[in-house]
Amino acid sequence: MANIKSQKKRVLTNEKSRLANKAFKSEIKTAIKKALNAKSNDEANKTELVNHAVSLVDKGLKKGIFKDNKAAREKSRLMSA
């Protein structure tokens, strides 16, 4: 553990951020799996799931959870499915 007061605060802040990012990544992974596994005969539902997953990926990019190329790759995979 750090001895400097500000560093002790950063350790706590980093842990909170790590847990929040982990939860958000899990939510995105679930949305992507649902979109990729959606039945092609229900086109309206599949489109809705893909749009939701793309939206979450964009939010992850905006928050700095994903890098540019990963977000682009995930969106490309979703759109082509």
From Swiss-Prot:
Keyword Lipid metabolism attributed: no
Keywords noted in UniProt: Ribonucleoprotein, Ribosomal protein, RNA-binding, rRNA-binding
InterPro entries assigned: Ribosomal_bS20, Ribosomal_bS20_sf
Biological processes annotated in GO: translation
Gene3D superfamilies named among the record's database cross-references: Ribosomal protein S20 (1.20.58.110)
Any Pfam family the entry gives: Ribosomal_S20p
Cystine connections: none
Superkingdom of the organism of origin: Bacteria
Cellular component annotations (GO), alphabetically ordered: cytosol; small ribosomal subunit
An annotated Gene Ontology molecular function: structural constituent of ribosome
SUPFAM superfamilies: Ribosomal protein S20 (SSF46992)
PANTHER family cross-referenced by the UniProt entry: 30S RIBOSOMAL PROTEIN S20, SMALL RIBOSOMAL SUBUNIT PROTEIN BS20C
Record's function text: Binds directly to 16S ribosomal RNA.
Similarity comment: family membership: Belongs to the bacterial ribosomal protein bS20 family.
Protein name listed in UniProt: Small ribosomal subunit protein bS20
Taxonomic source organism: Mycoplasma capricolum subsp. capricolum (strain California kid / ATCC 27343 / NCTC 10154)
Gene responsible for this protein: rpsT
